[in-house]
A protein has these predicted regions:
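Substrate-binding pocket helix/loop in short-chain dehydrogenase/reductase
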Residues: 94-107, 201
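Conserved glycine-rich cofactor-binding loop
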Residues: 17-18
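Alpha-helical segment proximal to the catalytic Tyr-Lys
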Residues: 123, 166-170, 229
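Residue(s) in the substrate-gating loop at a strand-loop-helix junction
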Residues: 137
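Short C-terminal tail/terminal secondary-structure segment
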Residues: 1-2, 142, 220-221, 232-245
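Active-site helix of classical SDR
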Residues: 118, 153, 161
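C-terminal helical subdomain
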Residues: 177, 196-227, 231, 238-240
Length: 245
């Protein structure tokens, strides 16, 4: 097996308390990294009621990515950060995102939050010649009429990834992303619980199944690894073929 070179590295997964973010956090933990995660609840114990939140072995920090001061104050230890994963994300259903205030709130978390965190750790990542991985969505590439704010914010994350990769390449910082398709998480339970919608989603995926948080974690670990050392500015689509059609 090729060593990804992540043993002992300092990793921060913003939004790593559940779903895709939690899968990513544990993928790094399995490689020997020191993994920090953020969430919005006061303490790690407050996530015990969520079955998909496994915080064992992870260092928890409360963070509201909408708060500039809170992001600036975030401290994960003396060692500089090696890998930043921006996995924050909110979505609203029932056409709620057509409300301009709801739209703005989603953009503030999903897109501006990623920029805030990237700026906060730019100096660290310059020191370590580290990398940023932004968790986008297949919605970066296809229409999502029910969630215009989610798709717009994740689409913005695609171009932010390219812009930061270009701007910070001279600092030795790589910036990439992944664009997951349908993944079984707390955010997608509404679709899973609707038999018609779920069956339709399966028919739209060439692999005929949804992805898992662990599979997304594998892609992110690769992007952060030494095997991807000449890769930057890319958004890797991990969607089972959803966007091929």
């Amino acid at each position: 097996m090729i060593d990804p070179g992540l043993d002992g590295k300092a990793v921060l997964v913003v939004g790593g308390t559940g779903g895709i973010g939690n899968g990513i956090a544990h993928a790094f933990l399995a490689q020997g990294a020191r993994v920090h995660v953020t969430g919005t609840r006061d303490a790690a114990d407050d996530y015990h009621d969520l079955p998909a939140s496994d915080l064992d072995g992870l260092e928890y920090h409360r963070l509201d990515v909408r708060d500039n001061a809170a992001v600036s104050r975030l401290y994960i230890g003396e060692a500089p950060l090696d890998v930043l994963v921006n996995c924050m994300g909110i979505v609203r259903y029932g056409r709620a995102e057509y409300d301009p205030e709801v739209f703005a709130a989603a953009v503030d978390v999903n897109l501006i939050g990623a920029m805030r965190c990237s700026m906060r750790f730019h100096e660290d990542l310059t020191m370590t010649k580290g990398s940023i991985i932004n968790v986008g969505s297949a919605s970066c590439f296809i229409a999502t009429p029910g969630q215009p704010a989610y798709s717009a914010s994740k689409g913005g994350l695609l171009t932010l990834t390219k812009s930061l990769a270009d701007a910070w390449g001279r600092d030795g910082v790589r910036v990439n992303g992944i664009a997951p398709g349908f993944v079984d998480t707390r955010l997608t339970q509404r679709t899973i619980g609707n038999a018609e919608a779920y069956d339709h989603s399966l028919r739209s995926i060439p692999l005929r199944r949804w992805g898992t948080p662990a599979e997304m974690g594998g892609v992110v670990v690769f992007l952060a690894s030494s095997q991807a050392s000449y890769l930057t500015g890319q958004m890797v689509i991990a969607d089972g073929g959803l966007t091929l059609r």
